[in-house]
From Swiss-Prot, chains A, B, C:
The keyword Transferase applies. One of its GO terms (biological process) is riboflavin biosynthetic process. The gene is ribE. It comes from Bacillus amyloliquefaciens (Bacillus velezensis). 2,4-dihydroxypteridine 2 binds at residues 47-49, 61-66, 100-102, 135. It catalyses: 2 6,7-dimethyl-8-(1-D-ribityl)lumazine + H(+) = 5-amino-6-(D-ribitylamino)uracil + riboflavin. One of its GO terms (molecular function) is riboflavin synthase activity. Lumazine-binding repeats lie at residues 1-96, 97-193. This is Riboflavin synthase. Pathway: Cofactor biosynthesis; riboflavin biosynthesis; riboflavin from 2-hydroxy-3-oxobutyl phosphate and 5-amino-6-(D-ribitylamino)uracil: step 2/2. Catalyzes the dismutation of two molecules of 6,7-dimethyl-8-ribityllumazine, resulting in the formation of riboflavin and 5-amino-6-(D-ribitylamino)uracil.
């Protein structure tokens, strides 16, 4: 469980591909300070398990399913990545539960600086936008962001200078691919609501429905 | 409160059945290192209270309700079990919010190795799947897992080699029974949504309802 | 933050009432071992601030609001109370997240011993049950408990012998009043869902809604 507050940006030291899976070695200082085997660390928003570590670097295994559903394939030696350790038990209940299970990717289609904020338009599938809500939360490469604009195929988020300087947002350009996790609560509500609708709409609003209700 | 990151596997030393309840004596080293009477330890995902301990073993009481709702009845002397101590205040939520209150059991119906991941199909009741969501979390024998496939009667989780080697997943086969805890967040939202649906549908659609909405 | 694992039962030495507020002096040994002015101690699940202490006793002030919302008024000299210190940095969440902010009281309406567990039916307001969920957590007089039964106006919890012997559950009878705190995660999600419902229901049922449904 994470909160979407990036702790530091690390650097890819090595990428070992074996068939469809991958092992990443990442240089970092803060998240390795108390690391142990089996710990969970979010790498660009993807929850990965630490399988090895030394002073200032750690290694993680990436399953085929995860490689396929994220932007990890676009990484190379020297790439910068957002890093966050799992939420600490005495941490604050942030406004946003992030599981680190990425739902898909999006493409940056517009970057616009307005006063002290930068607006990013992200093109993404309706499968993802359907569970989102205006002013709701979305995680972009592990960064918890607020949704300022929303349509069937795009989302607009606005990022403050501090977040840009502390994350890989600073390395992004129009055309960049980012990992997207939709807010957990929205996903649950969408599924429950549509399962109920499904059961209800199997009983479509028919003439009989009205007569049952005395019309 | 747990997080679904198993700390070690212990071994059943003795099982004492009294009527419908049970007392288990479990050999372990890591979770007994700082154990105290009254501590909570998750045994195959079930939160149990320590009622006795010595150097490398501890004893727990199991209520009839818990014996009935879980796979504990299938254990025997020498069985391996997953163990996790309650979240430490300075610990991290490497998995998700796990209460240790098991919701039911599931049967493993398929095990498939794909590259560096192993996929498990679990057959379980619609009463449990109704509160789950794709890419959501589920606890299997105390192991925090990601839902990669979901239907009314089954869930597919994928487990990385590290987790398999560190837990009793390594002892499981098709037909094995596992304990399931559904994600707490999903259960809450499901109940709230259906209570709201219930209150809404109790207000049958009346003449007044239509006029209020301008028809 | 507490976790609902009672450390010891203390004894009321003195109760000083001033208008609607109250000062309690409580005899205890364990929780006074490292006590300091300003520390938080949960008394029957109520987070109170230590305003004075000597070897084996401490004093706390109780605000009118807290006196009104809890069962403290029912205490007298010699009454036993459940005590728990705030989570220490190296403590463990053996129960669940407990804030010590009591939501209300409940009346015990049934006590039934079944094998090695005792079941308690608690009558409480729908305002409290609405945020609860089956197999979820609830705090009863500061004791973290699992919800085994739930209806609009009642909750059933089951308590193991160890917990009964270590807490004031042993002094309770049918008719006793207990303090209730509902699970923090449930309250948080309930509020979040109803805020979202409010935003949705502002979009009244329009002509379009009906034409979409074929009318």
């Amino acid at each position: 469980m994470f909160t979407g507050i990036v702790e530091e940006t690390g650097t890819i030291q090595a990428i070992k591909k074996t068939g469809l899976s991958m092992a990443l070695t990442i240089a970092a200082s803060k998240v390795t300070s108390d690391v142990r085997l089996g710990d969970s660390i979010a790498v660009n928003g993807i929850c990965l398990t630490v399988t090895g570590f030394s002073d200032n670097q750690f290694t993680v295994d990436v399953m085929p399913e995860t490689v396929k559903a994220t932007s990890l394939n676009g990484l190379s030696k020297g790439s910068k990545v957002n890093l966050e350790r799992a939420m600490s038990a005495n941490g604050r209940f942030g406004g946003h539960f992030v599981s680190g299970h990425v739902d898909g990717t999006a493409e940056i289609t517009r970057i616009e600086k307005k006063s002290n904020a930068v607006y990013y338009d992200l093109k993404l599938s309706p499968e993802l936008t359907k569970t989102l809500v205006l002013k709701g939360s979305i995680t972009v490469d592990g960064v918890s962001s607020t949704i300022f604009g929303l349509s069937d195929e795009s989302v607009t988020v606005s990022v403050i200078p501090h977040t840009i300087s502390e994350t890989i947002f600073r390395t992004k350009a129009v055309g960049s691919i980012v990992n997207i996790e939709c807010d957990m609560i929205g996903k649950y509500l969408y599924r429950f609501l549509h399962k109920t609708e499904q059961t209800k709409s199997n009983q479509t609003i028919t003439e009989a429905f009205f007569s049952e209700n005395g019309f």
